[in-house]
Amino acid sequence: MIGGGLVGTAAAAAAIFALVAPLGVQSADMVAETAPGQHRLIHLQDGTEIALNGDTRLVLDRSNRRTARLERGQAMFSVVHDETRPFTVDAAGTRIVDIGTRFDVLRTARGSEVAVAEGAVLYDPNGAAVRLGAGKLLRRMDGSQIVEVSQADPATVGGWRSGHLVYRDAPLWRVADDLARATGARIAVDPGVANRPFTGAIVVTGADRRGTLAARLGAVLDVTVARQHDGLYLKARAAH
């Protein structure tokens, strides 16, 4: 935890669960969708649990509950393993296959991430075919064939469920995206600092969801936080 961090616990809120298929989604599908700042926990009949972060859209096939498609946002999967029917997640057209596991998948406008807390997954079995064990984090940016694999603390994977956000050399734009997803606040980042790396831990509180985020972010991220009519804007501190 870094000094001046955001302290507290995250409270789950009610989410939107659409049983009626929207335009472009087959009627056999179920859509689970959360607004920014909301969480949702889905229990499947086989005992598998899926926790949804804020601003997330997940599609489940009614005829095959062992298949999910993450269209945007973040979800933590706690899968009851079945070797004869492996659980699969589709993110931006890439399959992630469970091998008895607890894992987190993030889908943003820039790319995808997979982090494993327990067990293992097979990422893109028909392409890159990368096996990820507990404590591994995979990143792949849209439009790139490069798959980056690094270390992650298994204990922090899916920490967003309790408001704990932990980073190691993460760009500020990623931190801002996570905070927006967690709190419901609109947060933009100046291009001059968007790729600045941040290492540390932030714990989001219920108070942050009520609008106190700006007062704390400046010291935590070493930026100037400007209030705008539609949210917050992070930029470099003025030189002294």
What spans do the regions from the language model cover?
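Single-pass transmembrane signal-anchor helices and their membrane-water interface zones
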Residues: 2-29
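Short extracytoplasmic/periplasmic juxtamembrane "stem" segments immediately C-terminal to an N-terminal membrane anchor
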Residues: 28-49
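Tight coil/turn sites that cap or link beta-strands
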Residues: 37, 53-57, 73, 92, ...
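A cytosolic small-molecule/anion-sensing beta-strand core signal
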Residues: 45-46, 54, 71, 117-118
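Edge/loop elements at the starts and ends of beta-strands within beta-rich repeat scaffolds
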Residues: 45-48, 63-68, 108-114
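Short Gly/aromatic-enriched secondary-structure transition segments
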Residues: 55-75
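Short, polar/charged, low-complexity connector loops/linkers at domain or secondary-structure junctions
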Residues: 86-181, 188
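N-terminal export/assembly leaders
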Residues: 145-240
